[in-house]
Amino acid sequence: MNSLEQVKGLIKEEIQAAVLKAELATEEQIPNVVLESPKDKTNGDFSTNMAMQLARVAKKAPRMIAEELVANFDKAKASIEKIEIAGPGFINFYMDNSYLTDLIPTIVNAGEAYGETNTGKGEKVQVEFVSANPTGDLHLGHARGAAVGDTLCNLLAKAGYDVSREYYINDAGNQIHNLALSVEARYMQALGLEKEMPEDGYHGADIIGIGKRLAEEFGDRYAKADEKESYEFYREYGLKYELAKLQKDLESFRVKFDVWFSETSLYKNGKIDQALAVLKERDEIFEEDGATWFRSMTYGDDKNRVLIKNDGSYTYLTPDIAYHRDKLERGFDKLINIWGADHHGYIPRMKAAIQALGYDKETLEVEIIQMVQLYQNGEKMKMSKRTGKAVTLRELMEEVGVDAMRYFFAMRSGDSHLDFDMDLAVSKSNENPVYYAQYAHARVCSILRQGEELGLATGGDVNYKLVTSEKEVELLKKLGEFPAVVADAAQKRLPHRITNYAFELAATLHSFYNAEKVLNQDNLELSKARYELMKAVRTTLQNALAIVGVSAPEKM
């Protein structure tokens, strides 16, 4: 626990003690202490509505209760300088700030671990994201989903959850079939044989390249092979190539998955039949008009859903149910799916399936990622100027860089539309939020290099109590918020809170820098304390940016 959390804990304990001392309620009657940080700091560092909460039990006016609580509150134990009562009975606490200086060594000693909390208590969480069809390039929607998903995973891990990142490979549908036929056609053509491309085939240069490589490596072996054997070969080779391309792009984007799960494996391992058997046993499916239906309306869906069509083929929902059953059987406590906006209507039927399988519907959470609109030179950019097609993740990385993409995609709530200004993303100005945050880190590193030249990095005693100016206190308070921000953002699945925090910390640092001469050769004792403060800022900013997947440069 960090110093700020300890102080909040002490205030809560002293509020409870004051309730008992004033005989306003018994221990069993005391409600949970709500302690908030007012946005307007003239209302104190912390505020509680305990007086209003106790009104019914104590049978007194909240204002009177507040006065009794204040009279019985031990300020010294909780590092409180003064207490004020506001409005109908809010109690505002003003810290004496002595606790803040303890934060500096706490943060510096914690290093990369600063900000870690045990909020998740080791809960096993699986996050499935991106999961694009492996037959083409990743586009902007996939890129935003990748950035948000990976940031959420980093955030959950920081908050004490046991996180697994998973990519679901849609390798059982017509698209993979067409890929196999396209590879076959290009292979045959490379051998000089006549073979038409399939109607919905893939005509890109990369598939032509695959065909040529196969011809060079295997000659006409697969042109003469058994049809089934050769088809499987084309399918596997094409899929392997496309997946390798996806993985390369995602790794360049700093996104790595723990598990790549194949849809085809659900068929091969009998998982679909098993899931259907469970639903049948629980009387969750029925036959009608030659088809097999799922009673999803039982669980709030707007209509029942077909699982097996009258021609014997499965609908998309059937392997999805089997896949989610497989996830749950692997022992995850929570499943988080990150889907595109076009999947919004799919949520009720998947939640219904989770319930029909015997699990709580809240086991499944779905985060929706809205569309991205690119802007360049103040105008909407619909297509790539280079290719005339939709802009890809790879192309945008080359245009604006990974840092800008990761930060911009993660700085808004995923369920809100995102306008991505390419000119802003590459500008070296304070208007560019990623540049602003990274520049703050580089500025701190520059100060630390100056401190080393002054001999401040030699160790020895540090008088942290000298760090008391208004701007220093603001900076310390902002540093102290980080673990609570991590915990709250993780619990509420709001990764954009971390980009907000990084920006706020950068702003607080810049404000401090502009107001104070940070290092002063004529006052080395104060400079030593401020040098350590800068180390704490560097650590915290690095840790925040790391969650977002953004680098922290030492020079800019």
UniProtKB/Swiss-Prot annotation:
It catalyses: tRNA(Arg) + L-arginine + ATP = L-arginyl-tRNA(Arg) + AMP + diphosphate. Belongs to the class-I aminoacyl-tRNA synthetase family. Its EC number is 6.1.1.19. Gene3D superfamilies: Arginyl tRNA synthetase N-terminal domain, HUPs, Isoleucyl-tRNA Synthetase, Domain 1. A motif ('HIGH' region) lies at residues 132-142. Keywords: Aminoacyl-tRNA synthetase, ATP-binding, Cytoplasm, Ligase, Nucleotide-binding, Protein biosynthesis. GO terms for biological process: arginyl-tRNA aminoacylation. The keyword Aminoacyl-tRNA synthetase applies. This is Arginine--tRNA ligase. It comes from the Bacteria. It comes from Bacillus cereus (strain ATCC 14579 / DSM 31 / CCUG 7414 / JCM 2152 / NBRC 15305 / NCIMB 9373 / NCTC 2599 / NRRL B-3711). The keyword rRNA-binding does not apply. One of its GO terms (molecular function) is ATP binding. It is found in: Cytoplasm. The gene is argS.
